[in-house]
C-alpha cells in the first residue's frame, strides 16, 4: 500500500506542476526541441475541460443513392428457372451476387446468415418459392457487376475526368465543416451503403444484412446558433442536438451489431490532432510511474486477498502481453470474444515446462473482432503458481479471474495514475518497443532500403505484440512471383554489367587514354546503380514475405507515437514519405511540427 500512496502523491504533484520534468533534450513537452511548432493550431484556442468547440456547422451526411433495379436481361434463377424478384429482395440478392467469387460465399455461417436475412426481405410468395440457397443461381447478377467494373476501367479520359469532378463537387458540399470559425475537413461524410456484413476473423454474424440508413436513423450534432443541416426531401432527422463535449457531427446505430457509427472530423483536423497528441502524452507520462506500478503488482502476487492477487496477475498480462482489458458483454451476444478480465479457464493451459522454458502459459481465445489470440509464453513463477490457484476446482467455462471485473480494474488503474487505462498501457508498451527495436536494428551506414526494412521489422514486433493479424492477401503468390521475376531479370542485368565492366577495365589497361577511362567510369556507375536496384528488390521481397500475415498499419496509426518514427527519419536521413503516406502525413501534421531528431518517447 505504501507504493500506491506514493503513486497517488506523485500523480497529485504532477497535476499541480510540482514534479520536475525530464530534461528538455529528451523531447519532453515544454522543451523547445519538442515544441518546434509552438504556435501550431492544435495548441491554440483551448477551451475549458470537456468543451471541444464553440461553433460547429455542417451540411450533414451524404446518403447512399437509392437502389437501381437490374436491367431486364439480368435474371435470377431458382432450380434452373428464372424468378422475378421484388425490388427489396433483388437489392439484397445483388449484395450476394457481387461476392460470388469471394471466399466468404463458401463459408457456411456467411451463407446461413445471408439466407435468413434475405428471406425477411422477400414477399410472402417469394418465400414460398425460394427455400434453399443451394438451389439459387446468381451467375447472371455476378457477371453483370463484373462487366460493369471492367467497363469502369476502360472509361475515356473525359469520362474519368467527369466522375472526378462529380466526386470533388460532393467533397466540397459535404466534406467540410466550420469549427470555431475555421474550415475543417470531415473524415467520412458518406454513410455506408447497405450490404452484407463481413467482420474480421470467423465472426458469427458474417453474412447478415446491413440495412440502409435513412435520415430518420441519424442524430445531428451542431451548435445552436448554426444553420441546421437540411435532411433529404421528404425526410427528417431522428434528433438534432448541440453537445460540445463530443467531436462527432452525426451518429446512428447500425443494424448488425447495434453499435453506434459516427461522422467524425478528418484525422488531420485541429481537434483530432490535439486528441492524438494528448493520447500519446498520457502514454509518455506512464514512463514516470511504470516502475512503481510494476513493483506494486509484483508485491500483490503474494496478497492475502484473492481479489488483489487476481488483479495483479491480470495487470501483469496487460503490461507484458499488451492484452486488452475486455468489456463486459450483454447476455446473448453472439460473438464469444474475451479480453484479459473475462478469460475463462478453457482459454488457458499451464505447462510446467515447454519449448525449453519453465512455467509456460498457453493462451487460446477469440479477441476483439473475433481475431484469434494464440500465444505460448514463459511467465514468472509466482504468476504461474497463482494461475494454478485460480484454476483449482473450476470448470472450463468458469471465469479465470472470478473476483475481477473490467470496471474494478479500470478504477484501480485510475488510482495508480490519472488517465491510466489498459489501452494506455498498450500504447506505452507499443511505442517503447518500437523505439527500442529501431535503436537495436538501425545502422547509420545502411542504405535507405535496408533502413526501411529495419523499420518494418520493428513495426512487425509491435504488431505481433498487439496481435494485429491479417489473412494472407489473395494476390500474395502472384505478386511474389512477379517480384521474383524482376529480381531474376535484375540479376541478369547485374551479371551483364559486371562482364561489361571487366571488358572496359581491360580496354583501359591496354589503351590508358581519357576515352577508355570515361567508358570505365560509366560502366562502374551502371553496375553500382543496378546492384542498388537489386538490393532494393531483394529487401522488398523479404519485407513482403515477413509481413504477409501481419497488419502493420493498425499499430502504426493507432498505438505508435508518430514522433518516434519522424525523429528516426530525421536522425537516419530517411524521407518521411517512405514511412507515412500523404494522408498519414496530414494526419500526423502535429508530430511533424513537434519532433526533432533527438525526440524520445
From Swiss-Prot:
The lineage of its organism: Eukaryota, Metazoa, Chordata, Craniata, Vertebrata. The record marks 152, 200, 248, 279, 337, 368, 410, 468, 486 as: Interaction with DNA. CDD domains: Topo_IB_C, Topoisomer_IB_N_htopoI_like. This is DNA topoisomerase I, mitochondrial. Its EC number is 5.6.2.1. It holds the Pfam family Topo_C_assoc. Keywords: DNA-binding, Isomerase, Mitochondrion, Topoisomerase, Transit peptide. Residues 22-48 are annotated as: Disordered. Residues 1-50 form a transit peptide. Releases the supercoiling and torsional tension of DNA introduced during duplication of mitochondrial DNA by transiently cleaving and rejoining one strand of the DNA duplex. Introduces a single-strand break via transesterification at a target site in duplex DNA. The scissile phosphodiester is attacked by the catalytic tyrosine of the enzyme, resulting in the formation of a DNA-(3'-phosphotyrosyl)-enzyme intermediate and the expulsion of a 5'-OH DNA strand. The free DNA strand then rotates around the intact phosphodiester bond on the opposing strand, thus removing DNA supercoils. InterPro entries: DNA_brk_join_enz, DNA_topo_DNA_db_N_dom1, DNA_topo_DNA_db_N_dom2, TopoI, TopoI_C_dom, TopoI_cat_a-hlx-sub_euk, TopoI_cat_a/b-sub_euk, TopoI_cat_euk. Residues 261-262, 324-329, 421-423 are annotated as: Interaction with DNA. Residues 268-601 form the Topo IB-type catalytic domain. Divalent metal ions (calcium or magnesium). GO terms for molecular function: DNA binding; DNA topoisomerase type I (single strand cut, ATP-independent) activity. It comes from Homo sapiens (Human). It comes from the Eukaryota. Its main location: mitochondrion.
Amino acid at each position: 500500500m505504501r507504493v500506491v500512496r506514493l503513486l497517488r502523491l506523485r500523480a497529485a504533484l504532477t497535476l499541480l506542476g510540482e514534479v520536475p520534468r525530464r530534461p528538455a533534450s529528451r523531447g519532453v513537452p515544454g522543451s523547445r526541441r519538442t515544441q518546434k511548432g509552438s504556435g501550431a493550431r492544435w495548441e491554440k484556442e483551448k477551451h475549458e475541460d470537456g468543451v471541444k468547440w464553440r461553433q460547429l456547422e455542417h451540411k450533414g451526411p451524404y446518403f447512399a443513392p437509392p437502389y437501381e433495379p437490374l436491367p431486364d436481361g439480368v435474371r435470377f434463377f431458382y432450380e434452373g428457372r428464372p424468378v422475378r424478384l421484388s425490388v427489396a429482395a433483388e437489392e439484397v440478392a445483388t449484395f450476394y451476387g457481387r461476392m460470388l467469387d469471394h471466399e466468404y460465399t463458401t463459408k457456411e455461417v456467411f451463407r446461413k446468415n445471408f439466407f435468413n436475412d434475405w428471406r425477411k426481405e422477400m414477399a410472402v410468395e417469394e418465400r414460398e418459392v425460394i427455400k434453399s440457397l443451394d438451389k439459387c443461381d446468381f451467375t447472371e447478377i455476378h457477371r453483370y457487376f463484373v462487366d460493369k467494373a471492367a467497363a469502369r476501367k476502360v472509361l475515356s479520359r473525359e469520362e474519368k475526368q467527369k466522375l472526378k469532378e462529380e466526386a470533388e463537387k460532393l467533397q466540397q458540399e459535404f466534406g467540410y465543416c466550420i469549427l470555431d470559425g475555421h474550415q475543417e475537413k470531415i473524415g467520412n461524410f458518406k454513410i455506408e451503403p447497405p450490404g452484407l456484413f463481413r467482420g474480421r476473423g470467423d465472426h458469427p454474424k458474417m453474412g447478415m444484412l446491413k440495412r440502409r440508413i435513412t435520415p430518420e436513423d441519424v442524430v445531428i450534432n451542431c451548435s445552436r446558433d448554426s444553420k441546421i443541416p437540411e435532411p433529404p426531401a421528404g425526410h427528417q432527422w431522428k434528433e438534432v442536438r448541440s453537445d460540445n463535449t463530443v467531436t462527432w457531427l452525426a451518429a446512428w446505430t447500425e443494424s448488425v451489431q447495434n453499435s453506434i457509427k459516427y461522422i467524425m472530423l478528418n484525422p488531420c483536423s485541429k481537434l483530432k490532432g490535439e486528441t492524438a497528441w494528448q493520447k500519446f502524452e498520457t502514454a509518455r507520462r506512464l514512463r514516470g510511474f511504470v516502475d512503481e506500478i510494476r513493483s506494486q503488482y509484483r508485491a500483490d502476487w503474494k496478497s492475502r486477498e484473492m481479489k488483489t492477487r487476481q488483479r495483479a496477475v491480470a495487470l501483469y498480462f496487460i503490461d507484458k502481453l499488451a492484452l486488452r482489458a475486455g468489456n463486459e458483454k450483454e447476455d446473448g451476444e453472439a460473438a464469444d470474444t474475451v479480453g484479459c478480465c473475462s478469460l475463462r479457464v478453457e482459454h488457458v493451459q499451464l505447462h510446467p515446462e515447454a519449448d525449453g522454458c519453465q512455467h509456460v502459459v498457453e493462451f487460446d481465445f477469440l479477441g476483439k473482432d473475433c481475431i484469434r489470440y494464440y500465444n505460448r509464453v514463459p511467465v514468472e513463477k509466482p504468476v504461474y503458481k497463482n494461475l494454478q490457484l485460480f484454476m483449482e476446482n473450476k470448470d472450463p467455462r468458469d471465469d479465470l479471474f472470478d473476483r475481477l471485473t473490467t470496471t474494478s480494474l479500470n478504477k484501480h488503474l485510475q488510482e495508480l495514475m490519472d488517465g491510466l487505462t489498459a489501452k494506455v498501457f498498450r500504447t506505452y508498451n507499443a511505442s517503447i518497443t518500437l523505439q527500442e527495436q529501431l535503436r537495436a536494428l538501425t545502422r547509420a551506414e545502411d542504405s535507405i532500403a535496408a533502413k526501411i526494412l529495419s523499420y518494418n521489422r520493428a513495426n512487425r514486433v509491435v504488431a505481433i505484440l498487439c496481435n494485429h493479424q491479417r489473412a494472407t492477401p489473395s494476390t500474395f503468390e502472384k505478386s511474389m512471383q512477379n517480384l521474383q521475376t524482376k529480381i531474376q531479370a535484375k540479376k541478369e542485368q547485374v551479371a551483364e554489367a559486371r562482364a561489361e565492366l571487366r571488358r572496359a577495365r581491360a580496354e583501359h589497361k591496354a589503351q590508358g587514354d581519357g576515352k577508355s577511362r570515361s567508358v570505365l567510369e560509366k560502366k562502374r556507375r551502371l553496375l553500382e546503380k543496378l546492384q542498388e536496384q537489386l538490393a532494393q528488390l531483394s529487401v522488398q521481397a523479404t519485407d513482403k514475405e515477413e509481413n504477409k500475415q501481419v497488419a502493420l498499419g493498425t499499430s502504426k496509426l493507432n498505438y505508435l507515437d508518430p514522433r518516434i518514427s519522424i525523429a528516426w527519419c530525421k536522425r537516419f536521413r530517411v524521407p518521411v514519405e517512405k514511412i507515412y503516406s500523404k494522408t498519414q502525413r496530414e494526419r500526423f501534421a502535429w508530430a511533424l511540427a513537434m519532433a526533432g531528431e533527438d525526440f524520445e518517447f
